Amino acid sequence: MTSPNRFDHVSVEKIANVYYEGRTFSRTVWFEDGRKKMLGIVLPCDADVPAYEFKTDSSERIEILAGECEVKLAGEEEFTYYRAGQAFLVEGHSSYELRNEAIVQYICHLEG
C-alpha cells in the first residue's frame, strides 16, 4: 500500500542542494520513469535575509507541504500568500522571491 506522504521506487541524491548558507536546502528525487522532483526545507527569513531569491532553468510547480510563505514571481509587484496544500508555477528561465516566518517544507515538480 502506498502512502500519500511517501514516494516508492525512487533514487535520492546523497548530497543536498544547499543555498543561503544552509538556510534553504533540498534533495533531488529521481523516479523510475525519469521524472525528477526536489524535496526541500526553507528556514525562516530574518533581518539578514528578508526574502530568498531563486532562479529557474526549467518550469517548476512548487507545492507547499507544510508551513506558509509569501511568493513574488518575476515581473509581479506584490507577494502572494501560500500555505500547505497550495502550489505556484514558476516559468523557466525566470525567478521568484520567497519570504516566510516559520519553516516551510515543499516539493518542486520540475515541469520541463
Q: Where are the regions a protein language model picked out?
A:
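Residue-level structural signal for beta-strand termini and adjacent loop
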Residues: 42, 75-77
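A short, N-terminal "cap"/entry segment at the start of jelly-roll beta-barrel domains
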Residues: 1-39
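Short, surface-exposed secondary-structure edge patches
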Residues: 61, 78-79
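Conserved short histidine dyad/triad with adjacent acidic residue
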Residues: 31-57, 82-83, 87-92
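Short, conserved beta-strand element in jelly-roll/cupin
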Residues: 56-70
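Ligand-binding loop in jelly-roll beta-barrel domains
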Residues: 91-112
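A generic structural motif
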Residues: 30-32, 72-74, 99, 111
